Amino acid sequence: MDAVEQVLVAEREWLLAHLHLDIPALEQLMDPDYLQIGAGGDALDKEQVLASFRSGERHWDEAQSAEHHVRVYGNTAVVVGRWRARGENAGRSFDYQARFVSVWVRRDGEWRMVSDQSTPIA
């Protein structure tokens, strides 16, 4: 499997971990330096994101990801795509479609997400 395929597998695992609230999988996929930039400009580190899932504050009922464009630069990969998620965050229901950018690094042979950002679309 080449690097592009490996990153796409990691992206799929990321989506499924969110959908199934699989905290251990999320922890494994997130780099210690992970930083999420939300649509509103908020920045959350790895522990903040994991805490929001552990508390039940956030959960997804549906998730889809498509239109992936992957670029690999040595041990770094950038993925641009489109996703849709439906669920609840901080007590509020959402049905969200966005373009996203995620950045992955390969450490000890494993791809880890170091950052992701999404921008809402209609």
Language-model features, listed with the residues they occupy:
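A beta-strand edge to alpha-helix "cap/lid" segment located at domain peripheries
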Residues: 1-122
